[in-house]
């Protein structure tokens, strides 16, 4: 997709959202089925079924997907798509890869130490870019990618998560 194609695809959406701001508000959904046979949750992604389970550092076998890895994968996917979209808009020639890593202290989630954080204490996202573009353009590309990456901004902003249940 080139810049003209991207603009053609996004133009009517941007115009509609300017005229009808409420049309831009969309609720995304995900759901999973609890596995009664093992400590796992089966998540339908729309493309495939992912079975998530315990990380080996919490007693899992490593045979199932780890939710923490899935969070980093979502960040990599979003940041990669955002970078490609921004690069296309800026008409920059950029290729490469995206890498994320995060630090966890599993004492927190296992309840071993109440002072230990439950969750990532730091996440690092890195782009390894192949490009002949000037550094100032790549700096701007990174700045705009960070600004418009939905998953990155959600993590950085610390959005509230409401836990609830219902019974049947």
Label every model-predicted segment.
Residues 1-73, 85-168:
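Extended beta-strand/beta-hairpin segments
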Residues 74-79:
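Alpha-helical metal-binding/catalytic segments enriched in His/Glu/Asp
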